[in-house]
Amino acid sequence: DFFTGMFDTSLGEGQIVTGVRFPVPERADYQKFVQPASRFALVGVFVAKYADGVRVAVTGASESGVFRWSEAEAALSANFSADAVPAAPGPEGMIGDIHGSPDYRAHLIAVMTKRAVAAAA
């Protein structure tokens, strides 16, 4: 709800963030596939396992910024294993540029999610 798009938030004029709270997950890991020249994430995935389920956040891939991959969250909530990660999400809405096509970025999301789950397990 806070991020409304790429480099855009819901903060109004004159507002500032004074605090942020995150629940501590039972297990978590962040994996990124870096763009060599900039070292920014071509795709980054954060996986966090909580008592009530799993959260999967994706960065660097979408035209609208950070998003949660709900299909992976559902699959990993049932079975927290790299083998449970679904096939790559569709390329719709993914960034396409000289560093990677939307299809490539979608594929990387699944790969980085599997790596994050394996590292957190």
Label every model-predicted segment.
Residues 1-121:
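C-terminal structural segment of proteins
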